[in-house]
């Protein structure tokens, strides 16, 4: 598999309190730090991300400390399958668990080994922040940890 990725740095900020990310993903192998999407500076791991951590889906925002951090209990072992991953962030929701929602193939994940939600009204760190690099298929700041697989229809 190629180590290709897409990158964009946005010039005008948009809403950091509400955003969604959606993509079809086919995993090439279950490796640690296989990044689907990232945004940030990568200085001292200062990044927001959606990635596969071995066979777990990990969704997080880390601009120096965790704004939110979820690691699924569901394992993703079928390397022949296409998975539709969707993350919805809305920190204005009154219930903490409604502020970050993760869906796989249209079904909301509800079981996590790590489960930290943002406070009400919290910015998501780097996503939709002016001047921050956003990458599909790798980490920011050097494009490390490329996804071992395919990403399409984002």
Predicted regions and their residues:
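Extracellular glycan-associated modules
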Residues: 1-153
């Amino acid at each position: 598999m190629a180590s290709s990725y897409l990158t964009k740095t946005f010039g005008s900020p948009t809403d950091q309190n509400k955003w969604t990310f959606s993509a079809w993903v086919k995993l090439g192998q279950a490796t640690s730090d296989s990044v689907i999407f990232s945004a940030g500076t990568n200085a001292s791991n200062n990044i927001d991300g959606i990635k596969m951590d071995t066979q777990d889906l990990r969704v997080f925002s880390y601009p120096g400390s965790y704004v939110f951090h979820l690691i699924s209990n569901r394992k993703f072992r079928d390397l022949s399958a296409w998975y539709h991953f969707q993350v919805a962030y809305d920190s204005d929701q009154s219930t903490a668990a409604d502020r970050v929602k993760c869906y796989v193939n249209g079904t909301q994940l509800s079981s996590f080994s790590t489960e930290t939600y943002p406070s009400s009204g919290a910015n998501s760190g780097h996503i939709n922040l002016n001047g921050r690099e956003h990458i599909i298929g790798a980490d920011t700041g050097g494009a490390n940890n490329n996804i071992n697989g395919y990403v399409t229809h984002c």
